[in-house]
From Swiss-Prot:
GO CC term, one of those recorded: membrane
Disulfide bond residue pairs: none
Protein name: Transmembrane protein 41A
Domain description: The VTT domain was previously called the SNARE-assoc domain. As there is no evidence that this domain associates with SNARE proteins, it was renamed as VMP1, TMEM41, and TVP38 (VTT) domain.
UniProt similarity note: Belongs to the TMEM41 family.
Length: 264
């Protein structure tokens, strides 16, 4: 009960702080209406139309209030990640539209890692009992898999991020229960989600620069789409290669054990 109350207090305080940050907007002379310039709050996008509208508003704000937009974006991203709220993919796309493909990618990778670690810490302090109570079977299954791969835990965590057998938010919540070291957890998120973040950020960068259908078929856009395809395919190829190698090792060890039994 005390853990739940503490978590609710932290959540309420963070929500209120983000609310103040998104409603006390500085006025921007580049925005034409008073409604756009400060008499309305910003919002989390729920579809591509809202995402595009929000992107246009924030890009106008960024011309005069670059630091404020940066702070607002980081706060919103960490809020979603720390409290395991779905929808970070929209923020990744927004990062590409606001900050460009490479700065956006770097920012999303860092924020994803910090936010996931925040979720780890909140779960460690407030949520262990709640997670075990509501998801006992999932925790038990994941615990078994982690223990089976304890010797190569970091690479197993990378595998889970690249090809999640369980949702990322649940892995963030259950990691302290599974005794996953926080340093390994942080860097597995930082590295393992690079392909996913890259795809989302590049998508946002492309969408923000398209002004007509002709621009969709430009060489620059074609190279970006090719890069997205390669990043999506390479991790799967590498994981498949390492999985086959591991399978051969297992087969070899099984053969040795069978031969030793025949000898005895």
């Amino acid at each position: 009960m005390h853990s739940l109350l503490g978590l609710l207090l932290v959540f309420a305080g963070s929500t209120f702080a983000l609310y103040l940050l998104s409603t006390r907007l500085p006025r921007a002379s580049t925005l034409v209406s008073a409604e756009e310039s400060g008499d309305r709050s910003l919002w989390f996008p729920s579809d591509l139309a809202e995402l595009r509208e929000l992107s246009e508003v924030l890009r106008e704000y960024r011309k005069e209030h670059q630091v404020y937009v940066f702070l607002l974006f980081c706060s919103a991203y960490l809020y979603k990640q720390s409290f395991a709220i779905p929808g970070s993919s929209f923020l990744n796309v927004l990062a590409g539209a606001l900050f460009g493909p490479w700065l956006g990618l770097l920012l999303c990778c860092v924020l994803t890692s910090v936010g996931a670690t925040g979720c780890y810490l909140l779960s460690s302090v407030f949520g262990k009992q709640l997670v075990v109570f509501y998801f006992p079977d999932k925790v038990a299954l994941l615990q078994k898999k982690v223990e089976e791969n304890r010797n190569g835990l970091f690479f197993f965590l990378l595998f889970l991020r690249l090809f999640p057998m369980t949702p990322n938010w649940f892995l963030n919540l259950s990691a302290p229960i599974l005794n996953i070291p926080i340093v390994q957890f942080f860097f597995s998120v930082l590295i393992g989600l690079i392909p996913y973040n890259f795809i989302c950020v590049q998508t946002g960068s492309i969408l923000s620069t398209l002004t007509s259908l002709d621009a969709l078929f430009s060489w620059e856009t074609a190279f970006k789409l090719l890069a997205i395809a390669l990043v999506a395919l390479v991790p799967g190829t590498l994981i498949k290669k390492f999985s086959q190698k591991d399978l051969r090792l297992k087969e070899t060890s099984n053969t040795h054990s069978l031969n030793s039994r025949k000898v005895t």
